[in-house]
Amino acid sequence: MDSADPQLNRFLQQLQAETQRQKFTEQVHTLTGRCWDVCFADYRPPSKMDGKTQTCIQNCVNRMIDASNFMVEHLSKMNGGHV
């Protein structure tokens, strides 16, 4: 099979895009689960989300994203800029 085959290249691009979507979805589920545990410690969400809970979830997600970005940058520096 020739690596310059346009169909193969399209397939590989689609496969890469799907893999990225799956990783993103997995990240969202992970963040949701962790922040749920932090912000709803009794495992019972209120019937209506109040300002305190909404702020908790926003702060939790933001901290998780910050931590993830920090780790990516740190690992990138350790690899000499190659992630």
Curated annotation (Swiss-Prot):
Disulfide bonds join C35-C60, C39-C56. It is found in: Mitochondrion inner membrane. InterPro entries: Tim10-like, Tim10-like_dom_sf. Keywords: Chaperone, Disulfide bond, Membrane, Metal-binding, Mitochondrion, Mitochondrion inner membrane, Protein transport, Translocation, Transport, Zinc. It comes from the Eukaryota. Belongs to the small Tim family. Mitochondrial intermembrane chaperone that participates in the import and insertion of some multi-pass transmembrane proteins into the mitochondrial inner membrane. Also required for the transfer of beta-barrel precursors from the TOM complex to the sorting and assembly machinery (SAM complex) of the outer membrane. Acts as a chaperone-like protein that protects the hydrophobic precursors from aggregation and guide them through the mitochondrial intermembrane space. This is Mitochondrial import inner membrane translocase subunit Tim8. It comes from Caenorhabditis elegans. The gene is ddp-1.
